[in-house]
Structures are given as structure tokens and as C-alpha cells.
Curated annotation (Swiss-Prot):
Database matches in InterPro entries: Toxin_16
Taxonomic placement: Eukaryota, Metazoa, Ecdysozoa, Arthropoda, Chelicerata
Record bears the keyword Secreted: yes
Sorted UniProt keywords: Calcium-activated potassium channel impairing toxin, Disulfide bond, Ion channel impairing toxin, Knottin, Neurotoxin, Potassium channel impairing toxin, Secreted, Toxin
Originating organism: Hadronyche formidabilis
Protein name per UniProt: Lambda-hexatoxin-Hf1a
Function: This excitatory toxin inhibits insect calcium-activated potassium (KCa) channels (Slo-type).
Subcellular location(s) of the protein: Secreted
One Pfam family per UniProt: Toxin_16
Length: 37
């Protein structure tokens, strides 16, 4: 089954950010990342 995306990893459609993190971005490189809340 899909797993959650950990902090400081790119947000992925398959795998929501893990509890305590949320998708932030996009950053200067154009990628959004899961970051600690």
C-alpha cells in the first residue's frame, strides 16, 4: 500500500505527506516538498 512522504521529500500524488508535515512550495527549483509543520 502507498506510504506517506516524509519530511524534506518532494510531494507525491501517490503518497500524502506524513502526519506532522504538509506540502510546501514550490521552492526556487520549482518542486514542492513535504515540510514539518
Amino acid at each position: 500500500s502507498p506510504t506517506c512522504t516524509g519530511a524534506d521529500r518532494p510531494c507525491a500524488a501517490c503518497c500524502p505527506c506524513c502526519p506532522g508535515t504538509s506540502c510546501k512550495g514550490p521552492e526556487p527549483n520549482g518542486v514542492s516538498y513535504c515540510r514539518n509543520d
